[in-house]
């Protein structure tokens, strides 16, 4: 399930943060990949401990924490502090899969159920740089407007194509969901979106709406794992 969240960051916010990112000190991203992924990785990465990474990361997490579409699709239990990368001068990231378990800065373990990319560069400012995600229906190429975010299963093989002009700056994020099974999560998402559409049409005490809401929460109770 690929979900696009439009304008998680407003245009003015993107411009402010991007100006700061352009002046940031970027490091070789290969030092942060696993053995296999490092061999196909050619990008730059912002140090996790930099003030800029922490401040912008906190802003992103705060935005996600109150976004209805994100909450509905991800059902988040834990969010790894956002990281930031930059691709330029032919930089790319070959086909790889994200590690199943990450250790967060607070030493807690996080199971990567959902991955997210938040685009911070305007798509017409660079060539290449598509996020290609392997799905059951073939590879899906994603290149969004600055401020837009895409969610996709962490189990997916994916890659970033070479950036041949300009630079592509983005944030990447991992989420542990309360519902680890992708199919169960997709079912809950579809049901929740249907309920949300009915809320605008029916009174709060409508029997059909109440039954559907009850079904949703009983399924969530069955599927959720802590």
Swiss-Prot record:
Every copy of the Fe2OG dioxygenase domain together lies at 78-177
What GO biological process terms does the UniProt entry carry, in alphabetical order? DNA damage response; intracellular iron ion homeostasis
Query: What GO MF terms are annotated?
Result: 2-oxoglutarate-dependent dioxygenase activity; iron ion binding; L-ascorbic acid binding
> Which residues does the record give as 2-oxoglutarate binding sites?
168
Q: What class of enzyme is it?
A: oxidoreductase
The cofactor binding remark recorded in the entry reads: Binds 1 Fe(2+) ion per subunit.
Q: Where does Fe cation bind?
A: 96, 98, 158
- Domain of life assignment: Bacteria
According to its UniProt record, the EC number is 1.14.11.-
SMART domains attached to this UniProt entry: P4Hc (SM00702)
Q: InterPro entries, per this entry?
A: Oxoglu/Fe-dep_dioxygenase_dom (IPR005123), PKHD_C (IPR041097), PKHD_hydroxylase (IPR023550), Pro_4_hyd_alph (IPR006620), Pro_4_hyd_alph_FE2OG_OXY (IPR044862)
Q: Which UniProt keywords apply?
A: Dioxygenase, Iron, Metal-binding, Oxidoreductase, Vitamin C
Gene3D superfamilies attached to this UniProt entry: q2cbj1_9rhob like domain, Rabenosyn, Rab binding domain
Q: Which cofactor does it need?
A: Fe(2+); L-ascorbate
Identify the PANTHER family for this entry. Answer: PKHD-TYPE HYDROXYLASE YBIX
What is the protein's name according to its record?
PKHD-type hydroxylase TERTU_2553
Species for this entry: Teredinibacter turnerae (strain ATCC 39867 / T7901)
């Amino acid at each position: 399930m690929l979900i696009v969240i439009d304008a998680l960051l407003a245009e003015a916010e993107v411009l402010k943060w991007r100006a700061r990112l352009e002046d940031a000190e970027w490091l070789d991203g290969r030092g942060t990949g696993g053995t296999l992924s490092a061999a196909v990785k050619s990008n730059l990465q912002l140090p996790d401990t930099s003030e800029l990474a922490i401040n912008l990361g906190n802003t992103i997490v705060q935005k996600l924490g109150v976004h209805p579409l994100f909450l509905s699709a991800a059902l988040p239990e834990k969010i790894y502090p956002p990281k930031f990368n930059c691709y330029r001068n032919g930089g790319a990231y070959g086909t790889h899969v994200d590690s199943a378990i990450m250790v967060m800065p607070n030493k807690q373990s996080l199971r990567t159920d959902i991955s997210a990319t938040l685009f911070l560069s305007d798509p017409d400012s660079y060539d290449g740089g598509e996020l290609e995600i392997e799905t059951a229906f073939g590879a899906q190429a994603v290149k969004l407007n600055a401020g837009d975010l895409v969610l996709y299963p962490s189990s997916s093989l994916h890659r970033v194509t070479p950036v041949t002009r300009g630079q592509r700056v983005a944030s990447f994020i991992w989420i542990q969901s309360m519902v680890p099974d992708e199919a169960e999560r997709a079912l809950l998402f579809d049901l929740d979106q249907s309920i949300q559409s009915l809320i605008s049409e029916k009174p709060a005490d409508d029997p059909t709406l109440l039954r559907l809401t009850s079904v949703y929460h009983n399924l969530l109770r069955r599927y959720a794992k802590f």
